[in-house]
């Protein structure tokens, strides 16, 4: 029986690395995973997912206007797939999350989503909130704060100061380095205090 999985964490916990490991394991056993990602995230270029340690794999980059159910149904009709793996699920829409549930329920294909639970403002991404409600299986991918506690928040740091207002979606790419901006995974206490090191 296929299931809808949501594997979530703060940044830098290894979500994409886990996705790549799962894809490898499927392929190593003669199975066919379909890897999808958001076209918003261009760090690895379009049609590719890449972990922070440098491992990458081809993928299909979709926009928030794409119908994922139709895409998977069409792809599956000519290339039988055994699993759908989605990176950066927080960049997709709630409607697309329901389409993923439809893939599980109607096509009987497992779907494993990887993404952030909250943005740097401490607010849940809409898709993450929906997945927390409807996914069959929830799995937290853990990482740690600089203090050693579990990191569950993402802090945006600009010019050495924690940012707590602005656009809730800011992609972590090379352009942020130009304006001395970075993301840091921290525990709740240090997120509230704005302490990142």
From Swiss-Prot:
Which Enzyme Commission number(s) are on file for it?
A: 2.7.1.21
Catalytic reaction list: thymidine + ATP = dTMP + ADP + H(+)
Superkingdom per UniProt: Bacteria
Write the record's keywords in alphabetical order, separated by commas: ATP-binding, Cytoplasm, DNA synthesis, Kinase, Metal-binding, Nucleotide-binding, Transferase, Zinc
| Pfam families assigned | TK
**Principal localisation:** cytoplasm
Gene Ontology biological process terms, A to Z: DNA biosynthetic process; thymidine metabolic process
The molecular function terms in GO held by this entry are: ATP binding; thymidine kinase activity; zinc ion binding
**What is the annotated signal peptide range for this record?**
none
- One GO cellular component, as annotated: cytosol
List of residues binding Zn(2+)? 145, 147, 187, 190
Membrane-spanning segments: none
Q: Where does ATP bind?
A: 9-16, 87-90
Task: Give the subcellular location.
Answer: Cytoplasm
Active-site residues are: 88 (proton acceptor)
Q: How does it assemble?
A: Homotetramer.
Q: Which family does it belong to?
A: Belongs to the thymidine kinase family.
Protein's name according to its UniProt entry: Thymidine kinase
Say which species the protein is native to.
Francisella tularensis subsp. holarctica (strain LVS)
Supply the gene name. Answer: tdk
């Amino acid at each position: 029986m296929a299931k809808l999985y949501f594997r979530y964490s703060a940044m830098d916990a290894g979500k994409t690395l886990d996705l790549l490991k799962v894809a490898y394991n499927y392929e190593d056993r003669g199975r066919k995973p379909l890897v999808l990602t958001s076209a918003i995230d261009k760090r690895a270029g379009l049609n590719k997912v890449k972990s922070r340690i440098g491992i990458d794999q081809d993928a299909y980059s979709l926009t928030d206007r794409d119908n994922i159910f139709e895409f998977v149904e069409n792809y599956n009709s000519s290339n039988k797939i055994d699993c759908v793996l989605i990176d950066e699920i927080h960049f997709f829409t709630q409607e697309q999350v329901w389409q993923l549930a439809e893939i599980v329920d109607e096509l009987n294909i497992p779907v494993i989503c990887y993404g952030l639970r909250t943005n740097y403002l401490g607010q849940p991404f809409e898709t993450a909130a929906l997945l927390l409600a409807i996914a069959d299986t929830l799995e937290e991918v853990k990482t740690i704060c600089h203090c050693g506690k579990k990191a569950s928040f993402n802090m945006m740091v600009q010019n050495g100061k924690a940012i707590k207002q602005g656009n809730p979606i800011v992609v972590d790419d090379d352009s942020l380095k130009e304006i001395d901006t970075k993301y840091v995974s921290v525990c709740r206490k240090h997120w509230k205090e704005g302490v990142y090191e």
